[in-house]
Swiss-Prot record:
Protein name (database record): Large ribosomal subunit protein uL14c
Lineage, opening ranks: Eukaryota, Viridiplantae, Streptophyta, Embryophyta, Tracheophyta
Gene3D superfamilies: Ribosomal protein L14 (2.40.150.20)
Function: Binds to 23S rRNA.
HAMAP family per the UniProt record, alphabetical: Ribosomal_uL14
GO biological process: translation
PANTHER family membership: 50S/60S RIBOSOMAL PROTEIN L14/L23 (PTHR11761), LARGE RIBOSOMAL SUBUNIT PROTEIN UL14M (PTHR11761:SF3)
Species of the source: Cuscuta reflexa
Subcellular location: Plastid
One cellular component term from this protein's GO annotations in UniProt: cytosolic large ribosomal subunit
GO MF term set: large ribosomal subunit rRNA binding; structural constituent of ribosome
Subunit: Part of the 50S ribosomal subunit.
UniProt xrefs under Pfam families: Ribosomal_L14
This protein's UniProt keywords: Plastid, Ribonucleoprotein, Ribosomal protein, RNA-binding, rRNA-binding
Length: 122
């Protein structure tokens, strides 16, 4: 469950290392975001000499949360961190590599490019 002011790790090589959520896209009164939701975030920590810089406002899709994800078959998945992938306006990732495991539910939300770049899909 991601809400405004939540800090997230970045799971790609776009140049950002840490994000802070400032808004959840989709509804004006929505309080929490879950896996597959798009957020507006500000970069809190960035890699030097990369295209993305600190204090830049970006869009990102959430790929891992500490809160459990319940599947229809009864399986529960929980990750060790909150992580997101920086995307552009069309929903394509800005980085060329994805780090860590991501859930297969992202394929249902039409983030097939992120799923294809990921080393492990749970």
């Amino acid at each position: 469950m991601i809400q405004p002011q939540t800090h997230l790790n970045v799971a790609d090589n776009s140049g950002a290392r840490e994000l802070m959520c400032i808004q959840i896209i989709g509804a004006s009164n929505r309080r929490y975001a879950h896996i597959g939701d798009i957020i507006v975030a500000v970069i809190k920590e960035a890699v030097p000499n990369m295209p993305l810089e600190r204090s830049e406002v970006v869009r990102a899709v959430i790929v891992r949360t500490r809160k459990e994800l319940k599947r229809d078959n009864g399986m529960i998945i929980r990750y060790d961190d909150n992580a997101a992938v920086v995307i552009d306006q069309e929903g394509n990732p800005k980085g060329t590599r994805i780090f860590g495991a991501i859930p297969r539910e992202l394929r249902q939300f039409n983030f097939t490019k992120i799923v294809s770049l990921a080393p492990e899909v749970l």
